[in-house]
Amino acid sequence: MSSVFGKPRAGSGPHSVPLEVNLAILGRRGAGKSALTVKFLTKRFISEYDPNLEDTYSSEETVDHQPVHLRVMDTADLDTPRNCERYLNWAHAFLVVYSVDSRASFEGSSSYLELLALHAKETQRGYPALLLGNKLDMAQYRQVTKAEGAALAGRFGCLFFEVSACLDFEHVQHVFHEAVREVRRELDKSPLARPLFISEEKTLSHQTPLTARHGLASCTFNTLSTASLKEMPTVAQAKLVTVKSSRAQSKRKAPTLTLLKGFKIF
């Protein structure tokens, strides 16, 4: 599929070496980004969470019989894109999420896709993007039709899916794995430089805001807030690893799955 986002940034290597993929989850507050992340990583559904926390998780996956080291950044932009460079300079691919029962979240997803398109144009690098309509279990309250979602995805040349983080692990897993496949497809065409890895100990130098140069005022680049990278525990291990971003201090709890990134998991 032709995309306005171009090609990903990643190193090449033997197929025996796990492909490293950084995936950023973008969207407005309440779209279900955290629920999708935890569903994919633990097969569990969360009912409560702190929307102000931003974490990056690491998981070893097998996609099409090939090993993948997948890092997932669960962003916390609230209602508008903010401090965008923390994920624009980090991710190989983006999952843009909206809730099918929220017109506002759908409109917000359009802003993220525009931001990604501008960034790809300026850097002349590629970022596979997938548009995801979440909360399909709330379809009786739907404010955004499937046709509208497909049309928006078509406008930016990205893949489109509708899922429910509440009900459906297999389809959620398929979306994350499809993001990996998109990165592979682009790397097969033209492998480029490795991505920028970030930690809380280091921040990026300030640059002229991308959106200021293009009139997209919603994204601001204040003091960069970057998330720590943590290995995601398996459900069987039931070991909690909770890391808050620079908005809060890091925490480690006793072995349990009661809380994960401020979530209650059922």
Curated annotation (Swiss-Prot):
Swiss-Prot/TrEMBL keywords: GTP-binding, Hydrolase, Nucleotide-binding
Pfam families from the UniProt entry: Ras
A Gene Ontology molecular function term of the record: G protein activity
Catalytic activity: GTP + H2O = GDP + phosphate + H(+)
SMART domains: RAB, RAS, RHO
Residue ranges the record marks as coiled coil: none
Domain of life, per lineage: Eukaryota
PROSITE patterns found in the cross-reference section: RAS
Residues the record lists as binding GTP: 27-34, 74-78, 134-137
EC number from the UniProt entry: 3.6.5.2
InterPro entries documented for this protein: P-loop_NTPase (IPR027417), Ras-related_GTPase (IPR051065), Small_GTP-bd (IPR005225), Small_GTPase (IPR001806)
NCBIfam families xref list: small_GTP
Similarity-based family: Belongs to the small GTPase superfamily. Ras family.
Protein name (record): Ras-like protein family member 12
Species classification: Eukaryota, Metazoa, Chordata, Craniata, Vertebrata
